[in-house]
Amino acid sequence: MTLIVTGAAGFIGANIVKALNERGETRIIAVDNLTRADKFKNLVDCEIDDYLDKTEFVERFARGDFGKVRAVFHEGACSDTMETDGRYMMDNNFRYSRAVLDACLAQGTQFLYASSAAIYGGSSRFVEAREFEAPLNVYGYSKFLFDQVIRRVMPSAKSQIAGFRYFNVYGPRESHKGRMASVAFHNFNQFRAEGKVKLFGEYNGYGPGEQTRDFVSVEDVAKVNLHFFDHPQKSGIFNLGTGRAQPFNDIATTVVNTLRALEGQPALTLAEQVEQGLVEYVPFPDALRGKYQCFTQADQTKLRAAGYDAPFLTVQEGVDRYVRWLFGQL
């Protein structure tokens, strides 16, 4: 049976395609915005049946052009949290997603989709419930609105609907994301170019580099998606994070120490890295004040209750692995 991945040439989509390939799944229709031609590089080592532009996909899918489709992994979206064009964001992230959802419901196709922890905004609790949801930007709002649609249609749905609120994802195949790539990616490139990494200084009661996030490896993100793909009877909206909050300083020290290890140099503590000028703190930008999550930590209660019991990589494990992968791409 055919599988469809939207946003297939993007960061998470391409990793899902690769994970499906590793299980022997190759009857995959990859859907993406083909105006960004360079993104095809994420699929060069993947096996797919077809590669469609997003503008033609929904109509053809709704028409039944692809025969029996077992599942759609809907990862396609504008993920730029600094995008201010509300119409563009709503068209891409809300209306387009509704059209894909409607086609899946009509055909009895599993629908697994990307939600976002941006829905929680400045909340101090990250539980999949309406009272904790207060997005700070139009990206988060577009995801929030779609999750409200899901909550309304899920009770009557005859096929699986599984949404994943991704926390701070990092890992291979994100280089095309530019400024929205992970801090691990930017730290890697900064250190190679300048011999140091830069982090935000103190802000909102947090010390330099001490803003904390739930950093989750894209390897784990793909594994969770495939777990629910294998269990089509399980529906819901689930946090997808490690359940641990770690400071940006942990990312920086891991990047620096992994690169040092690759050059045969010993590991250093954060204090030693700062003292030697390998980690530098810059003033918090005015443009982000009031729109920035200083703390995120996924509540995994629902995810674990749904049967996902595998451990998640820590920053030290996942970022080390990622830096070695990036180094191998040079």
UniProtKB/Swiss-Prot annotation:
Spell out the catalytic residues.
Y139, K177
Needed co-factor(s): NADP(+)
**Cofactor: bound how, per the entry note?**
Binds 1 NADP(+) per subunit.
Copy the pathway line from the protein's UniProt record. Nucleotide-sugar biosynthesis; ADP-L-glycero-beta-D-manno-heptose biosynthesis; ADP-L-glycero-beta-D-manno-heptose from D-glycero-beta-D-manno-heptose 7-phosphate: step 4/4
Q: Name one GO molecular function term.
A: ADP-glyceromanno-heptose 6-epimerase activity
Residues reported to bind NADP(+): 11-12, 32-33, 39, 54, 75-79, 92, 143, 169, 177
Q: Which reaction does it catalyse?
A: ADP-D-glycero-beta-D-manno-heptose = ADP-L-glycero-beta-D-manno-heptose
**This protein's superkingdom?**
Bacteria
Name the residues that bind substrate: N168, R179, H186, F200, G201, E202, Y203, R213, Y292
| UniProt keyword list | Carbohydrate metabolism, Isomerase, NADP
Do the record's keywords include NADP? yes
Q: How does it assemble?
A: Homopentamer.
What's the domain remark here? Contains a large N-terminal NADP-binding domain, and a smaller C-terminal substrate-binding domain.
Q: Which NCBIfam families match?
A: heptose_epim (TIGR02197)
* Official protein name in the record: ADP-L-glycero-D-manno-heptose-6-epimerase
User: Which species is this record about?
Assistant: Burkholderia mallei (strain ATCC 23344)
Lineage at the top is: Bacteria, Pseudomonadati, Pseudomonadota, Betaproteobacteria, Burkholderiales
